[in-house]
A protein has these predicted regions:
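Core segments of small alpha/beta cavity-forming domains
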Residues: 77-146, 215
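Exposed beta-sheet edge and beta->alpha loop/turn motif
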Residues: 1-44, 48-52, 153-215
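Generic signature of intrinsically disordered, low-complexity segments enriched in small/polar residues
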Residues: 42, 48, 60-63, 108, ...
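Structured interaction patches on ligand/partner-binding surfaces of diverse proteins
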Residues: 52-80
Length: 215
């Protein structure tokens, strides 16, 4: 069988019958790489895809003349998911505190993936949050306390990206319409977070906070 193609995450390794397949000639695109095996005898093989921090994928494949290969995505390990949940909490708090201080997108861009740098929507959405916080026409936001973060996987990972739903306890402090100190608390406040792996680091591809989060 000639030219079998397997598409896997760019940092992963492919092996057949415990032999790692050379990926030096692989093509890469959007966080994935495609490994083409020039020739393979027909028969049954144990295929395995592994990557640090991800659950290994293993299956038996029956290679025949009608076999063309496949695309495989990996699930994060429990340790990786827990670490990403903690990172999401840190990143959300950082973005909220930065917006509260009126910082520009340029001052927070290091938490985002390189693909976001050309995405004006994310930059504009962040500026909307800053503008909402800084707008004191109706109420004046004086402080935020976001804690008790909990993350769960949201759908299947794809193209080296992992999406999560993060819940947290939200405490918002502000001066209300009548000039009195007030606060609003909500448990289970949801944030939708997507991370992309770049050079071994997980970076945000979307803005997890929005102007509608505030009173």
């Amino acid at each position: 069988v000639e030219n079998l193609s397997y598409t896997i995450p760019v940092d992963a390794s492919l092996s057949l019958n415990d032999k790692v397949i050379d990926d030096s000639s692989a093509t890469t695109d959007d966080g994935q790489k495609t490994i083409t095996i020039p020739y393979l005898f027909t028969g049954k093989y144990q295929l395995q895809v592994t990557e640090d921090g991800m659950k290994p994928y293993s299956e038996y494949v029956d290679v025949s003349y009608s076999t063309y290969g496949e695309s495989i995505n990996l699930l994060p390990s429990e340790e990786t998911l827990a670490a990403l949940g903690e990172q999401a909490g840190t990143d959300i708090k950082f973005l909220l505190e930065s917006a509260l201080q009126g910082k520009s997108f340029k001052e927070v861009q290091d938490v985002f993936a390189s693909t976001v740098m050309d995405n004006s929507a994310v930059k504009n959405d962040y500026q909307d949050v800053v503008d909402r916080i800084q707008n004191t026409d109706s109420i004046k936001l004086t402080g935020l306390d976001v804690s008790d973060f909990n993350a769960t996987l949201d759908g299947q990972p794809y193209n080296n990206e992992i999406s999560m739903i993060v819940t947290a306890t939200w405490n918002e402090y502000y001066i209300n319409y009548w000039g009195n100190a007030d606060n609003y608390q909500e448990t289970g406040r949801k944030f939708y977070v997507t991370y992309r792996k770049e050079d071994g680091q997980w970076k945000l591809t979307t803005l997890p906070i929005a102007s509608y989060h505030f009173v």
